[in-house]
Amino acid sequence: MILPTSEDRRIIWLQRWLALVALALIGTTWRLWTASTEFPRIPWFSWLCEIPNWCDRVALAGLISGLVSVLVLAPWRERFAAPKVRLAIFAILAVSGGMLLLLDQHRLQPWAYQFAWIVLVLATAPAGRALMLIRLLTIGIYLWSAISKFDATFLATTGPDLLHGLWQTLALDPHLLDGNRASTLAWGLPLGELAVALLLAMPWTRRFGLLVSIVMHGLLLVVLGPWGLDHQPGVLLWNLYFIGQNILLFGARIEPVAGSERRWGLAEMGISLALLLPILEPFGWFDHWPAWAVYAPGAERVTLLLDAAAAERLPESMQAHLGSPQWRDGGRVVRTDLWSLRALSAPIYPQGRFRAAVASAIIERYQFDEGATLVVESRADRLTGDRERRVFRGADAIKRHATSYWVNTRQ
């Protein structure tokens, strides 16, 4: 593959690649963006709860039109580089995309958050500076993702699960993962991400880092694909995006354009925030996904339990999302994670606040005054995996807990 060597041409390829993958991701998760299912829509601010669902569709139409414009116009540099044209396109992307994200916390999927920062950079920085900033963002994603997985819970659960999926897909000897070997080998997953971050950060190892990153994402495609753990298409598309993006960012040498350097600006401020805010995540002051804690199972757990009578009152569409009876009286767990995957083709937002909001919305919708219990487990201790548990019984106690968060939990 022959890559363009000029900054302007490389950034055009990156813009088109981002627009293409973003359209594909929106297409595979379209129900998430249209507010067209029973799954609760939880805005970030309570004053947004009254906005009708048709506004989501108008904003989505604007976002799609902006992405299509980038895809179609980017090859015509003279037209796309015209200040008025670029301003109009990126204004449409910013307004429509921002509205969609504000109207539902669930939409802050990791790829959507990443793309939002990249669009800010593309809109406000010259080509050379934009490439440098997006490189920094990419390195930061690998770094923070690795740090989030140096965790007892990951090494005991998700890490071994991924390894078992890889072993099964590649038909490797399963006995190699017997006993504690899987947990020991799971250390290689965050260490691999950390190695990619360090290799990409240093110019003299960047090409090797690119190769390692491609192998890593390729293996994830194998493990998470339909021939492995069969995860949602969005997960596969995001990994595919990283392969293409990294080739464009860290591939063949790029010839700088005169005048592409500049001082501190809006793009630099945005990427600095994206790289620094994850520091707050372990203290509970920043959400898991924006901190790039992906596939990190140590987040707060929130589980809604219904007794047998309450479970029977659910409509048939909700019965499919109930877990097996776990109580002596036949009580059931409401699997909101499965509900999200089946209804929206997207993983549920992992924050305890959001899961409590979804539980509260279910109780309010089906008027469960009694028969509902919410079990809230704290984030896992990084060294031991231990959690503290709180139990809220009845609709009033559950709603009080849901409204105790700083961020909105109303639908």
Task: Annotate each language-model stretch with its function.
Residues 1-411:
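Alpha-helical membrane-anchoring segments
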